[in-house]
Structure formats: C-alpha cells, structure tokens
Amino acid sequence: MRFDLEPPSSVAAAHRTGVLLINLGTPDAPTPRAVRRYLAEFLSDPRVVEIPQVVWQVLLRTLILPLRGRASAKKYAAVWMPEGSPLRVYTERQTEGVRHLLASNAYQVTVDYAMRYGSPNIAQALAQFKRAGVERVLLMPMYPQYSASTTATAFDAAFAALARMRNQPEVRTVRQYADHPAYIHALAEQVRQYWAQHGRPDFAAGDKLVLSFHGVPKRTLDLGDPYHDQCQQTGALLMAALGLSTLECRVTFQSRFGKAEWLQPYTAPTLRELGAAGVRRADVFCPGFTADCLETIEEIGMEVRDEFIAGGGQAFHRIPCLNGAHAWIGALGEIVAENLQGWPVKAAQPEMVN
C-alpha cells in the first residue's frame, strides 16, 4: 500500500486540535448531471443500500440514476438558495458559529466541516487539518441519533483516510447525542420560538405536532441498529420539554425509498390521515435533521403539506430545523467541549504567585 505524502515533520509543529463537523452531503449544483453524480456516490455506499453490489449497481446505473437524476434536480432547484445548497449553507454557518463560540471561550482549536458524500469530503478535510499541523481530531457527526447508514459510514470514510496516512492524528468520535440535555433544550427552544412568532397550535381543539425523523429499512432495527430507539427517545424527551403527550404529538418516519418496509408510521400517510380525521392544523418538526435540506424543505414543506391539505387539513406549518439557532450553536459547543476534555485545547494559564 502506498501512503499519502506527508508534510515535513518538525519539532516545532503546531500540535493543534481539530474539530470536524460531518454532515451527509449535497450535489454541487441543482442540475441532472450534478445530482446523478451525487446520488451515484451516496447510493453506492453499502452502508446505505445493504444488498449485493453486483446486482445493485446494475439497477442503480441503468434504471435509478437515469430516472431520479432529472426529477431530483428539479426538486433541488426548488429549494436552492442564492448562496448554494441549503444543507451546505447552514452547515457553513454552524461551523462558523462553533468556531466563534469556542474561540470566545479561549479554546485554541481548528473547526471545519466535511460532507460524507460530495464536497468538501472527509478525506480532503483531514488532509487540510494535517497541513495545518493538527495532531488531534474530534469527529462530530451532525446526526444526533446513531445509525450505521449515517454515523458509521462517516467514521468509515474518516478511518479509510487515516489508513492512507503515515503519520496519523489522535482521533475521538462522538457517537450520538440523542438524549443530550443541551440538544433537547435547543429543539424545544426552536419549537417555542416558532410558536411565539406564528401562534401555538390549539391542542385542545385537536391540532397536532408531528416529529418526523428520516426513515431507514425496518430490517436494520431487527439487525440491531439503535436508530429507531434513539429517535423515540429524542421524541419522548422533546415532548416532555414542551409539556405535550402522545395525544398531542407523535413520532413518524419519512423519506422511504424502494418497496421494502421501513420504520413506521410513515410521515406522509400520517399527515393525510390526520387531515381526513378532521385535524385542522398540523405542525411538523424534524428533530433528526440539524440543518434544513431537500428532505425538510421540499419533502416536508411541499409534498407532505400537500398530503395534509388533500386529506382535509387546513393549516400546515413546517418548523425550520435547528440551522444556526443560538441555542443550537450553544449545544454544539457544549457537546464538543465535553468531548475535548483531557486534550490541551486552551492556552496555558499563568500560575498564581502568592
């Protein structure tokens, strides 16, 4: 095996610590070509699609990418921001927020972000850390709930990059923070602030709050993936923080792909059923998505909204994701700081002289 070229070794190396925020990824542009390139990388990950690759690649290249590329590009174009992809824009803002927060608290760390699929990728970010003299790395997935198809594959990519390094950094990983008090507080604050601006649902009259998490195939639960249980845990803690019961709030799962059974109940059918049952207003919040993206803005804000209205509902509210909310940046900083303990990340303080 040939290893990557290393920067010159020096006794005067920076000995820095790096914090890498990792999110899923996004196409570089809302065009069929860019979307197909992104989907090819994403859907070729065996952590994401757990069927024999020989069979899957034939289906992916001959059927799925040609059909989904153009259709998905139209959806991306509908949510694209002037600055670029929403996921990238909000992730950059979160990175800058954490960087500023840690610096203001005397942390001497390098903070950056990477995407599991697309760019900037994890290997590129780790290489940049190495060039900056980083010798300790904290991998911080932006997925509060652990899943093999998100958290584990992000770590896979990082470890694959490390395997090509002659001089590896010390590494720590943040596995999950589904029940972290600061994360739950940030979620509750996001919902409360939205209601303060747009009015609180009339739960006494039957209005509902739906907490929609990204779905995964049900077989992953049967095979031991803790994602489902952690989503339910987050949902229960958020309900408690908001003072709601399961009569007023429910947990659902979205973004089903293919014909296999996924975690249920499914979000879109649930909203249609609520509308048909006479629910006047439904608010949908996506606690597992730390930044707004195609699945929240387009799928929830457009497709699921249409399902609710078609079912007979009247008022649909999509509560924005955490994005750059002050409480969320504070929570990120707190979680990062907890996982940096024991590393020399603050300037040495002069000793007190009596």
Swiss-Prot record:
GO cellular component: cytoplasm
Amino-acid positions noted as binding Fe cation in the UniProt annotation, renumbered to this chain: 214, 295
Pathway assigned to this chain's UniProt record: Porphyrin-containing compound metabolism; protoheme biosynthesis; protoheme from protoporphyrin-IX: step 1/1
Reaction catalysis annotation: heme b + 2 H(+) = protoporphyrin IX + Fe(2+)
Biological process per Gene Ontology, one example term: heme biosynthetic process
InterPro entries found in the cross-reference section: Ferrochelatase, Ferrochelatase_AS, Ferrochelatase_C, Ferrochelatase_N
Predominant cellular place of this UniProt entry's protein: cytoplasm
CDD domains to which the protein is assigned, alphabetical: Ferrochelatase_C, Ferrochelatase_N
Record's function text: Catalyzes the ferrous insertion into protoporphyrin IX.
Record family assignment: Belongs to the ferrochelatase family.
Protein name from the UniProt record: Ferrochelatase
Species for this entry: Burkholderia ambifaria (strain MC40-6)
Gene: hemH
